[in-house]
Design a protein with these regions (language model features):
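Rhodanese-like catalytic fold shared by cysteine-dependent sulfurtransferases
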Residues: 2-6, 18-23, 36-38, 46, ...
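Core residues of bacterial helix-turn-helix
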Residues: 37-40, 50-52
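Beta-hairpin "wing" of winged helix-turn-helix
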Residues: 66-76, 83
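Short, hydrophobic-biased segments on the C-terminal half of alpha helices
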Residues: 62-63, 207
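Short capping segments at the starts of secondary-structure elements
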Residues: 28-31, 39-43
Length: 245
């Protein structure tokens, strides 16, 4: 039978385990890597490029996150692909961000500067999306789009948007989204769209935020490309048609 003294020590030990997680999360670089992995799995080179960090530094941070079981890894040939351990890790990141937003005035300043929506405006926009009343543009890299996106969204990575904006129909309002409220890609996409004469707004929620709200998310192997509007030709290579016997 376990002694009362040992029971007490074991009860206190859980704080050490919590601190283990907290220590790993107490790094802006590791939080950045974790947020990127919430968008989809990546290898070290891809993560380093997306995070603006060196491969060596990113690898060290990922090893610490792996030791705390926040991320998992599997080998793909010569590369190692990382992903979040499970959805509870993504949820914990969202809760941490929500806590910071509720108690730190600096977060409110950042949100305003990045164009955060008011709650009522956000809900109205989500309702219009659910009713398929808008054209959705996913401004993230195509790999993130494949990992999960809003149903019906068109994959138009921000760096491709200026050359492909003509593919978007003009009949409806366009809503662009990216990685979440602290990602500037969607607001930049709206600037490009408005400059081209479109009615456009941004949604300040990313796919992990939408999943947390039980908004349907779909996956696809290939990005959906819009049909070119009248007067323009698609720059994509046409598929070979199968001959009908």
């Amino acid at each position: 039978m376990i002694s009362s003294d040992r029971r007490r020590r074991r009860a206190l030990a859980h704080y050490e385990e919590l601190a283990r997680i907290g220590k790993v999360l107490a790094s802006p670089v590791r939080l950045r890597l974790l947020d990127l992995l919430r968008q989809g799995s990546r290898n070290v080179d891809e993560l380093a490029e997306a995070a603006g960090a060196t491969v060596a530094n990113s690898s060290r941070h990922l090893q610490q996150m792996r030791s705390a079981r926040l991320v998992s890894a599997e080998r793909e040939g010569k590369n190692v692909r990382y992903r979040i351990a499970d959805e509870s890790v993504s949820a914990a990141y969202g809760l941490l961000r929500g806590l910071a937003e509720s108690i730190l005035p600096e977060m409110d300043v950042l949100r305003r500067e990045l164009g955060a929506l008011e709650a009522g405006e956000r809900e109205e926009l989500l309702g219009r999306i659910a009713r398929s009343e808008v054209t959705l543009v996913d401004a993230r890299p195509v790999e993130e789009y494949r990992a999960g996106h809003l149903p019906g969204a068109r994959s138009m990575p921000l760096d491709e948007l200026p050359g492909r904006v003509h593919e978007i129909p003009r009949e409806r309002e366009v809503v662009a989204y990216c990685r979440g409220p602290y990602c500037p890609m969607a607001t930049r996409a709206v600037e490009i769209l408005c400059a081209a004469g479109y009615r456009a707004r941004h949604l300040d929620l990313g796919v992990p935020d939408l999943r947390a709200r039980s908004v349907p998310i779909t996956k696809s192997e290939e990005p959906r490309r819009a049909k070119p509007t009248a007067g323009h030709r698609s720059r994509s290579t046409p598929r070979k048609q199968r001959k009908v016997p």
